[in-house]
Design a protein with these regions (language model features):
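Intrinsically disordered, low-complexity acidic Ser/Thr-rich regulatory segments
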Residues: 76-101
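Short secondary-structure boundary/capping segments
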Residues: 59-64, 132-138, 195-202, 238-243
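VWA/integrin I-like adhesion module and closely mimicked acidic/polar interface patches used
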Residues: 151-157, 168, 187-236, 247
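Von Willebrand factor
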Residues: 129, 133-179, 189, 226-229, ...
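Negatively charged sequence features
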Residues: 1-68, 74-76, 80-81, 115, ...
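C-terminal helix of von Willebrand factor
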Residues: 242-266
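An active-site-proximal "capping" alpha-helix that borders the catalytic cofactor pocket
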Residues: 96-113, 118
Length: 266
């Protein structure tokens, strides 16, 4: 109960009215006020922009689990086959839904006042790890960021481990009480040369797992959201005891992302 505040507390007003009618001196504390909870959060969103994100959300396979060829010529053929990029598109791609989700989460975080960065990643062999900035952690939102979102396009393969480690270095410079890495992907980690002979898929998964453990050791909480319907097969290993969610309907990503962020950070 407050003597001054934003709005009347209807229960207190009724009680005061009853007191007056019965000859009792009413309380002057008739108001209430919303107390804003001080948040100290920094979060990086990592978007997978591998070639598979060029797929239509209607025609995407139940699993984005492919064998990435190590031969350079075969690798480029593989990348081109995954992109399927035509001049005119009449369908929505996975990457288009990722962009929509980015716009919505930006709107939510601008209202919350949390520190946040949005980056996208891919890979083209060990010497060509791709990491691009959509919005840096220290950057104020501006029209240039909207332009960067528009220009995001499917690239190569899914080299997660190095992208996560680079993100750790970015968050290490921020002294927020709560720090998070939010990984958004459509498939398992894989890339040309992202392997040891005979254990290609396992090596990529375990390297990513180790990168996530390194994040936790720095006080950073990782979370993975995937639209790969068979994601449980490898995420149980890759995420260890970290949280993840497999989204069965890709079109729900823009609505689900802010909900998960709220649950994760409160």
């Amino acid at each position: 109960r407050l003597e001054d505040g934003e709005e009347f507390d209807i229960d207190d007003v009724i009680e005061a009215f009853v007191d007056i009618k019965t000859g009792v001196s009413p309380s002057e504390k008739l108001y209430w006020r919303r107390n804003k909870i001080q948040r100290d959060v920094a979060c990086v969103f990592l978007l997978d922009v591998s070639a598979s994100t060029a797929e239509s959300i209607e025609d995407s396979s139940s699993s984005n689990d492919w064998d990435v060829p190590d031969d350079p010529v075969d690798y480029m053929k593989w990348v081109k086959s995954r992109r399927k990029s035509g001049i005119v598109r009449t369908y929505k791609r996975i990457i288009d839904v990722e962009k929509e989700a980015s716009v919505l989460i930006i709107d939510a975080l601008e209202n919350l006042g949390d520190q946040y960065g949005i980056y996208c990643f891919s890979g083209y062999g060990r010497e060509n790890v791709e990491f691009y900035t959509i919005k840096d952690l220290d950057e104020k939102f501006n029209d240039s960021i909207s332009g960067r979102i528009d220009r995001v396009a499917p690239l190569h393969a899914t080299r997660m481990g190095p992208a996560i480690r680079h993100t750790i270095t970015k968050l290490a410079d921020h002294e927020a009480r709560s720090r998070f890495i939010f990984l958004i992907t459509d498939g398992r980690p894989q890339d040309r040369g992202y392997s040891r002979q005979g254990v290609e898929k396992e090596y990529a998964v375990y390297d990513t797992r180790q990168a996530l453990i390194e994040a936790r050791q720095q006080g950073i909480t990782p979370f993975c959201l995937t639209v790969d319907k068979s994601g449980h097969d490898y995420l149980k290993t890759m995420m260890d005891d970290f949280s993840y969610e497999v989204l069965s309907d890709i079109s729900m990503l823009p609505a689900r992302l802010p909900e998960l962020y709220k649950n994760l950070t409160t």
